[in-house]
Amino acid sequence: MATIEAVGAREILDSRGNPTVEVEVLLDDGTFARAAVPSGASTGAYEANERRDGDKGRYGGKGVEQAVEAVIEEVGPALVGHDAHEQRIIDRVMLDLDGTPTKSRLGANAILGVSLAVAKAAASAADLPLFRYLGGPNAHVLPVPMMNIVNGGAHADTGVAIQEFMIAPVGAASFREALRWGAETYHALKSVLKQRGLATGLGDEGGFAPDLPSNKDALDLIVEAIGKTGFAVGSDIALALDVAATEFHGADGYDFEGSKRSAEWMTGYYEGLVSEYPLVSIEDPLSEDDWDGWQHITNALGGKLQLVGDDLFVTNPERLQKGIDLSAGNSMLVKVNQIGSLTETLDAVDLAHRNGFSTMMSHRSGETEDTTIADLAVAVGSGQIKTGAPARSERVAKYNQLLRIEEELDDAAVYAGAKAFPRSAGFTGRA
């Protein structure tokens, strides 16, 4: 048994220059571990609450000194002496100490930082890599990297409404090869943008953020870039979207490409995209509160591709269960800071998988060098990970960790590839 001896925390900066929480845990056997908490730009209304200081004279009110103090003054003392391997008990102690349904008293950023740091310390004490400690002996599937190479929406200051245009190297034989294919396509896209006289500035997640006339223009540019690499559009490299529709949804519908649109119209628009492009996944095609619309689009498109709930489910078992009951969506995005603890995240993933929902592990737009989600993707067998473009070190850190995991697994490693998207089997793509 390795017990918790000390818990510390500090305020650090994330990839957008905003403060976030970093937690350190020391065990009685000398084991030490550290974890940092990410933060989102487009956040769902039903996410667990971050604790921010609100002092406009310091970091524009985004400081996290109060969350740091909560870790040091309340959470740490409550956990000292607990067995670090009892993750569920440790998380329960913190949830009870917080006492709110949204973790608003201590802050989800405080609780999650401790939860992840404890898990990493326990894995180290057990002399196991984190993916093996969390996933057991059967953790061996490397995820498809869903690379966000064109940024729009809340991740870029342009006229493109859809937030993320992703490539998925489904035809690769290994994660290592998939990463190369993605990086080569990324660089090919930069060349295409330069040739067109378009901006090659980067959005929050490392993707390019050109100002384009329409969302289809972004897809066309990516298809052109894939063609320049020599890879086959669809069978080698498929496409995916994160629409983040909640960001442009109001009381009178969806404000999309200059017009007010209904959920039915949006569904028809996506049906057109699916028929024209090799799309394997659409995330948040409709708003987080548009349950009727989600039922409609799932009925129309759920048999053809993955419909991912991010803002809809917020990695919350209760929200996910509602989606399961209503047949709204067929996949869940997994963001550890949406729910705010490791065990609650694992419970949500388990519920999804038991009910035939796929899962996609995900970063946030405000990231750090922490690589926990890479291990977590392999541990739970998500088969997909979304952690940005193959650029910016806070994104690449996760990809590099997956390279290490694949190397460690050696012959036991299996790359998910096209099998991660069974609903899209047989699509032909567009030449």
UniProtKB/Swiss-Prot annotation:
Cofactor annotation remark: Binds a second Mg(2+) ion via substrate during catalysis.
Pathway per its UniProt entry is: Carbohydrate degradation; glycolysis; pyruvate from D-glyceraldehyde 3-phosphate: step 4/5
The listed locations are: Cytoplasm; Secreted; Cell surface
Q: Which cofactor does it need?
A: Mg(2+)
General function of this protein = Catalyzes the reversible conversion of 2-phosphoglycerate (2-PG) into phosphoenolpyruvate (PEP). It is essential for the degradation of carbohydrates via glycolysis.
Q: Any idea of its EC number?
A: 4.2.1.11
GO MF annotation terms: magnesium ion binding; phosphopyruvate hydratase activity
Q: Which UniProt keywords apply?
A: Cytoplasm, Glycolysis, Lyase, Magnesium, Metal-binding, Secreted
SUPFAM superfamilies reported for this sequence? Enolase C-terminal domain-like, Enolase N-terminal domain-like
Protein family per UniProt = Belongs to the enolase family.
| UniProt catalytic activity | (2R)-2-phosphoglycerate = phosphoenolpyruvate + H2O
Q: What is this protein called?
A: Enolase
What positions does the entry give for (2R)-2-phosphoglycerate binding? Answer: 163, 335, 364-365, 386
Annotated Mg(2+) binding sites: 242, 283, 310
